[in-house]
Amino acid sequence: MPRTSLLTLACALATGASAFSYGAAIPQSTQEKQFSQEFRDGYSILKHYGGNGPYSERVSYGIARDPPTGCEVDQVIMVKRHGERYPSPSAGKSIEEALAKVYSINTTEYKGDLAFLNDWTYYVPNECYYNAETTSGPYAGLLDAYNHGNDYKARYGHLWNGETVVPFFSSGYGRVIETARKFGEGFFGYNYSTNAALNIISESEVMGADSLTPTCDTDNDQTTCDNLTYQLPQFKVAAARLNSQNPGMNLTASDVYNLIVMASFELNARPFSNWINAFTQDEWVSFGYVEDLNYYYCAGPGDKNMAAVGAVYANASLTLLNQGPKEAGPLFFNFAHDTNITPILAALGVLIPNEDLPLDRVAFGNPYSIGNIVPMGGHLTIERLSCQATALSDKGTYVRLVLNEAVLPFNDCTSGPGYSCPLANYTSILNKNLPDYTTTCNVSASYPQYLSFWWNYNTTTELNYRSSPIACQEGDAMD
């Protein structure tokens, strides 16, 4: 036996590892690396867009996405943010004001980092596109939704027999409804028109707890959110650089922030954005952190009441998990907004920083990176696993959280197969820790006090398709 093979075998015996793992059959003389030593996810602008840019999968812990050996997914509960969209009308107004300053110098030739403006046009065709989901380019929102449905058909199609009518649920906002429809087309294919039943749940506060978008109108922890400045020193540096390259522009740090907001939306509608390179990597990192602050203090664990808001979904999904697929059903697909997913994560107690995020500097290494949590099309999937006994765990039922297609361990409850949590333990933890929504948010007694639509749903297909044109800047489709 060659010396190299003996050495491999000796090392394997000493460590208990297989001598032939990771492609040991590949000739030892090859110079090609089996694994790349370059990991550049941290440099991707998609991770510094905050919640504005195209979907990207969460950076994982290396836990296999497929079910652990000996386990089968028997129930899925998903909540998905709408797909990629154009800016909101309010953001559009600020963007147009910043662009007006850029164009005010009446130059025939922009220079430096803005030289591309000599050929560039704004990607929003007219004001009616504000709020709408995008339909053009490889990152288009409706394309994202359809592809996601198709991917989940491949992953979870075994949970549908091809004959029963499956209800799925959308909040009553225009782009959310369109996302749900495209996802449904991707998942059900030709059967979408007959075997899927879209249920649209109003976003009105009078829905109380029977909602995908519960509100907390008595929220008394919004002081930090209300006083966020959306500024870091790097924006002043960017303004000075762009002004020096194009005299007379007179951009401020606030203008730069609005231009970066504009840049962060462009890929939603186009395959390429020159605006990305108009700002440095440091400036993008700063922007991403400003977005982290916005979500943390305005719709996440930085607001002590958000866990109660998210508890509505967390508690109802816990009931589904304990009822199981035979009693409750196997598939629960839900569609809402980014700021409806972040409270759920707060309620579950995952991705909580050890201390509040500082406002005056970037907190590197904190777990609350919004580009990894709720990009456009972001989604939280709860899997119920039916598992056989292994050397490490008993036969039984387990729970896994999957955030943007990366397994997210449930805090210290990871004793199950694939670092899953035993359903009994998951239930005990949530029953102990979930706050009460109706009490915390002083929900009117005349409003619904719990989520019921997962059990009381329609099975008609009347809402599967639009019956009227999309309105200009359409928001709440149920107004």
From Swiss-Prot:
Positions annotated with a glycan in the UniProt record: 106, 191, 227, 250, 315, 425, 442, 458
GO cellular component: fungal-type cell wall
Enzyme Commission number, as recorded: 3.1.3.8
One Pfam entry name: His_Phos_2
Active site: 82 (nucleophile), 338 (proton donor)
Gene Ontology molecular function terms on file: 3-phytase activity; acid phosphatase activity
Keyword Glycoprotein among record annotations: yes
Keyword list, A-Z: Glycoprotein, Hydrolase, Signal
Keyword Nuclease appears in the UniProt entry: no
Catalytic activity: 1D-myo-inositol hexakisphosphate + H2O = 1D-myo-inositol 1,2,4,5,6-pentakisphosphate + phosphate
Record's signal peptide: 1-19
Job of this protein: Catalyzes the hydrolysis of inorganic orthophosphate from phytate.
Sequence similarity: Belongs to the histidine acid phosphatase family.
Name recorded for this polypeptide: 3-phytase B
UniProt source species: Aspergillus niger
Protein's gene: phyB
